[in-house]
Amino acid sequence: MFRLVGLFFLVLGASAAVIEEEENVIVLTKDNFDEVINGNEFILVEFYAPWCGHCKSLAPEYAKAATQLKEEGSDIKLGKLDATVHGEVSSKFEVRGYPTLKLFRNGKPQEYNGGRDHDSIIAWLKKKTGPVAKPLADADAVKELQESADVVVIGYFKDTTSDDAKTFLEVAAGIDDVPFGISTEDAVKSEIELKGEGIVLFKKFDDGRVAFDEKLTQDGLKTWIQANRLALVSEFTQETASVIFGGEIKSHNLLFVSKESSEFAKLEQEFKNAAKQFKGKVLFVYINTDVEENARIMEFFGLKKDELPAIRLISLEEDMTKFKPDFEEITTENISKFTQNYLDGSVKPHLMSEDIPEDWDKNPVKILVGKNFEQVARDNTKNVLVEFYAPWCGHCKQLAPTWDKLGEKFADDESIVIAKMDSTLNEVEDVKIQSFPTIKFFPAGSNKVVDYTGDRTIEGFTKFLETNGKEGAGASEEEKAEEEADEEGHTEL
């Protein structure tokens, strides 16, 4: 009998998975995952890879968030799972990149889309697990909310069921990484220095306090918050990226500069002085060129180390259109004039191009750059198939031998040109590349541009060319433009 009881407890003990913590972050495995997820009402899970640079950058901030929540006595837990070891779990939740964060509420997952610093993580979690705006009873509650994050927004209303209060709460519900507070108490009104109903944004930098003084609408308040939540000049980091690129302001003035440079402080001040004039219209961001991860951004703008420091402006509204200033000296006056000219629409987009190689047409696959693209691809007497690639792209490297063979196959056909262009160093005004490799067909006697969406094989490309761009074709640029216009003009009856 005793042996049976002992065996029962042994089996019971074996069935309970071991749950460990590292810096207050629960270490998840395939064995304990379901138990932990189902045993907590709220748990944020990071799916990571040990070799992932972004995961390494996130780790200390993630641990800080877990520790702070634990010290506050919160029921919200943070966990992490090594997706390279427990692949079946990450596959189940369709993890396609690292780090991927998901909040599990009573076992049901939702995507995390907040910032990567501990304040943003905590603010997002509290917003998702509690009221969209915290009720504030007195001045102490205001101070506590202000201390909880670098940026907070507080609204005072006589009646929290009023139209203005509802608008405030609707905006609060849509901004996950900023804590909001709301109150009807006179003590709160006095603490946030209001004479009547109103909204105030507090931040631990720049001017500290900004009062909303516009007509209250959802769009207006949201834009105002996004414009004022950032510093006059922000540094681009993995932590600030989601706020910078996810905000309402789509025009960004970028200063590429080394923080180790002796002229950094002066340049930052010149940049900051210019930023004051364009608050709410253009974001001013500096990119530290000493950071290895920022090399890809420099490459995107075609910048080399010997060109630094440098200013570039980008519009995210029009397929990430870039603008290059015509000045060399970085001063407040020059930056301001350039930015105003951009807003006035008098600055032409900057299109990158390498010089035309001497041997560009020596091999079966022709080499295109910005400077010879129109001449070759738009030749009305030729059917031209172009691969737009990036040197670092794995899929492009896999395609390379096939593309070379395709060039050889059609080398003697004077009506067909097989070409390629490095899109990290060359741009064409009306050809927008969103991913690599992208393959486009420029048919003879036509202004159409057709995307190739078929198999990336000799057979697939051959059939496409022999059917004059029909077999394996996606929508043409013209058809895509028409579809977009139809979508914009469509209204529900």
UniProtKB/Swiss-Prot annotation:
<feature type="domain" description="Thioredoxin 1">
    <location>
        <begin position="17"/>
        <end position="130"/>
    </location>
</feature>
<comment type="similarity">
    <text>Belongs to the protein disulfide isomerase family.</text>
</comment>
<feature type="site" description="Contributes to redox potential value">
    <location>
        <position position="53"/>
    </location>
</feature>
<feature type="site" description="Contributes to redox potential value">
    <location>
        <position position="394"/>
    </location>
</feature>
<dbReference type="GO" id="GO:0016222">
    <property type="term" value="C:procollagen-proline 4-dioxygenase complex"/>
</dbReference>
<feature type="active site" description="Nucleophile">
    <location>
        <position position="393"/>
    </location>
</feature>
<dbReference type="InterPro" id="IPR013766">
    <property type="entry name" value="Thioredoxin_domain"/>
</dbReference>
<keyword id="KW-0676">Redox-active center</keyword>
<feature type="active site" description="Nucleophile">
    <location>
        <position position="55"/>
    </location>
</feature>
<dbReference type="GO" id="GO:0006457">
    <property type="term" value="P:protein folding"/>
</dbReference>
<dbReference type="Pfam" id="PF13848">
    <property type="entry name" value="Thioredoxin_6"/>
</dbReference>
<feature type="short sequence motif" description="Prevents secretion from ER">
    <location>
        <begin position="490"/>
        <end position="493"/>
    </location>
</feature>
<keyword id="KW-0732">Signal</keyword>
<keyword id="KW-1015">Disulfide bond</keyword>
<comment type="subunit">
    <text>Heterotetramer of two alpha chains and two beta chains. Exist either as a phy-1(2)/pdi-2(2) tetramer, a phy-2(2)/pdi-2(2) tetramer or as a phy-1/phy-2/pdi-2(2) tetramer.</text>
</comment>
<dbReference type="GO" id="GO:0043412">
    <property type="term" value="P:macromolecule modification"/>
</dbReference>
<dbReference type="InterPro" id="IPR005788">
    <property type="entry name" value="PDI_thioredoxin-like_dom"/>
</dbReference>
<feature type="site" description="Contributes to redox potential value">
    <location>
        <position position="54"/>
    </location>
</feature>
<feature type="site" description="Lowers pKa of C-terminal Cys of first active site">
    <location>
        <position position="116"/>
    </location>
</feature>
<feature type="region of interest" description="Disordered">
    <location>
        <begin position="467"/>
        <end position="493"/>
    </location>
</feature>
<feature type="disulfide bond" description="Redox-active">
    <location>
        <begin position="393"/>
        <end position="396"/>
    </location>
</feature>
<dbReference type="GO" id="GO:0034976">
    <property type="term" value="P:response to endoplasmic reticulum stress"/>
</dbReference>
<dbReference type="InterPro" id="IPR036249">
    <property type="entry name" value="Thioredoxin-like_sf"/>
</dbReference>
<dbReference type="GO" id="GO:0030968">
    <property type="term" value="P:endoplasmic reticulum unfolded protein response"/>
</dbReference>
<feature type="glycosylation site" description="N-linked (GlcNAc...) asparagine">
    <location>
        <position position="334"/>
    </location>
</feature>
<feature type="active site" description="Nucleophile">
    <location>
        <position position="52"/>
    </location>
</feature>
<keyword id="KW-0256">Endoplasmic reticulum</keyword>
<keyword id="KW-0325">Glycoprotein</keyword>
<dbReference type="Pfam" id="PF00085">
    <property type="entry name" value="Thioredoxin"/>
</dbReference>
<dbReference type="GO" id="GO:0005788">
    <property type="term" value="C:endoplasmic reticulum lumen"/>
</dbReference>
<keyword id="KW-0677">Repeat</keyword>
<comment type="function">
    <text>Involved in cuticle formation. May play a role in the unfolded protein response.</text>
</comment>
<dbReference type="GO" id="GO:0003756">
    <property type="term" value="F:protein disulfide isomerase activity"/>
</dbReference>
<dbReference type="InterPro" id="IPR017937">
    <property type="entry name" value="Thioredoxin_CS"/>
</dbReference>
<feature type="disulfide bond" description="Redox-active">
    <location>
        <begin position="52"/>
        <end position="55"/>
    </location>
</feature>
<dbReference type="InterPro" id="IPR005792">
    <property type="entry name" value="Prot_disulphide_isomerase"/>
</dbReference>
<feature type="domain" description="Thioredoxin 2">
    <location>
        <begin position="342"/>
        <end position="470"/>
    </location>
</feature>
<feature type="site" description="Lowers pKa of C-terminal Cys of second active site">
    <location>
        <position position="456"/>
    </location>
</feature>
<dbReference type="GO" id="GO:0003810">
    <property type="term" value="F:protein-glutamine gamma-glutamyltransferase activity"/>
</dbReference>
<feature type="signal peptide">
    <location>
        <begin position="1"/>
        <end position="16"/>
    </location>
</feature>
<protein>
    <recommendedName>
        <fullName>Protein disulfide-isomerase 2</fullName>
        <ecNumber>5.3.4.1</ecNumber>
    </recommendedName>
</protein>
<dbReference type="GO" id="GO:0005783">
    <property type="term" value="C:endoplasmic reticulum"/>
</dbReference>
